[in-house]
Amino acid sequence: VQGFTFSNVTVNAFIIGFNHNNTREGGNRIHFLIGKISGKDVALCDSKYNNTGTDAGFRMNKSNSNAGGWNGSYMRKDVLGNSGSPANPPVNSLMAALPADLRNNMKSTTKYTDNTGNGQNNASSVTATTDYLFFLAEFEVFGSRSYANSAEQNYQKQYDYFKAGNSRIAYNHTN
């Protein structure tokens, strides 16, 4: 995936919601996280983690900027693979690395996030994207916001999984 090779790694997906926020995100959806390794919540990371640069890697953008917001991000389009579809995922994307039987059952979800970026923090910056793979928003995890666009929470709901007290921490999958 974007220059990182996963070898002999089994990452389990697990369900965090059924029909979550279905009036905005679409009905008959099962929301899941990727993933857990040996029961521990993990985040997929590579050597580019917490570094800026222009080469391929697990980073939000290839520049030190959030211009274009989530919609225009390198992470959304190239790393996760939302510029394609489960039937035709972009080469070297996480979507392409998923098992075909999982991809064959994926449905798109509408997510509302700041798709302008640059710290404008206004309601007009919050628009919809249609994604198969996505990052959870701050409000969806914590039920409150400190850093995200203040208007995002008007379109989002906290996942019951996190409301129930499950860990909000994901560890680097290589540790």
Task: State the predicted function of each range.
Residues 1-175:
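Collagenous Gly-X-Y triple-helix signature in extracellular proteins
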